[in-house]
Amino acid sequence: MGIDTWAVDFVLLDGQGQIIGDTVAYRDGRTAGIREALEPALPFAEHYARTGIQYQPFNTAYQLAALKNEHPDQLAAAKTFLMVPDYLNFKLTGVAANEYTNASTTALVGAESQDWDDEIISKLGLPREIFQPIRMPGQALGPFTAEIRDAVGFDCTVLLPATHDTGSAFLAVPARDDKAVYLSSGTWSLLGVENPQPITTPESCAANFTNEGGYESRYRYLKNIMGLWMIQSVRRELGEKAGARPTFPELIAAAQACSDFPGVVSTGDDRFLAPKSMIE
């Protein structure tokens, strides 16, 4: 079996393998202003040139910097850093490892080296020893622990897929050539291509394209675009008010029945990332 999840979110474990503190979702506002605060020590142009990862306010590097500011005791007590799918794999197998495609989204992995960038980690003031060896998708982690095996009644080998769900989605596209353009749509829409080498030029940085790690050491060169998050949020809010959520076809029909909106909305604006009310 293999597990994939969204990217950027993580857990910290103590020396006994127990979670330290809360696991915080990436839409939390704790990273506000972190990039600007880090700019003197780590200019974003340098950060991008080394990692190839686009600016997003919720990048793992910024989450860890925010944690260092708010709860330095948690970071000091940490022995292990795991992304969300890494942690689930750890619970199943007892093996602590960081899978490459998800690790690449942290903005802590060198685009060329495909390994942890010690200089970036040092400039952020993070403990290097918490980061585990990076494992490539396709490798086997191992069998279930005895505890899991007894609980489920069978054994199973846990394999590493591209544990970033977009990496697995791109891998599933039945493209036959190197010029294919991919669009993976869900809460986010990810539009891009696969490249054999990262593109970390100043022009790429200015356009805020990202180079996420892919299967067989390839790079998913793409743009993050607002996906279904806005309509998902509106649907949830309407359901909370009415007691039952409208269907997506009902929402689309209601929107089509309205008069044209005279303005243009930039759906990529940060105010839509985690508003208290998407409707308002």
Give each language-model segment a name.
Residues 32, 39-51, 57, 62-95, ...:
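Active-site core segments that coordinate phosphate-bearing ligands/cofactors
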Residues 142-143:
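Hydrophobic alpha-helical transmembrane segments
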